[in-house]
Amino acid sequence: KEDSLDVNFLISEGELVKVRKIIIEGNSKTYENVIRRELMIFPGDTFSRKKLLESYRDIFMLNFFRDITPNVVPVGNDEIDVIFDIEEKESGQANFSMGYSGVTGFQGGGGFQFPNFLGKGQLLSISYNRGLSNSYQFSANQSESISQSFNIEFQEPWLFDTPNLVGGSFYYQEKGQTN
């Protein structure tokens, strides 16, 4: 007689629960609608772990937050609240540069970038560069070549609260010579 072993598994899923409220805490700079528009889970939905994780991922991908902790809190037998505890991070950037080249002379510039401008999820970028070089000609005259440029860019990722990105930029460049 051969040995045998029968194994029976009894799998029982828990009761389905509905999402009662979505609560967002910890956002002092970012407007709540900027976060809510990334959600895949909504009040009244049957709770889905997959949708909760997708919402977490999409909020994280904004890159405005240092930490995001989603919490599920039971409220009664068949409802839950979903709480997103958010820690914002500084998202503005500044850059400065200086350099010298025998061909182009001295150059310098700087700029600022605000990826969450005024907490609305918009992008504002401003930069300025200036260059100065000396050249000597055979007639012993010295001339200076000056160049400067200015750029400003703005993007709105949700035009009229729809996921349509619109943006524009203005670029100005000036080159000249003095004797």
Regions found by a protein language model. Give the residues of each.
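Acidic, glycine-rich low-complexity/disordered segments
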Residues: 1-74, 90-92
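Gram-negative/organellar outer-membrane beta-barrel architecture
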Residues: 48-179
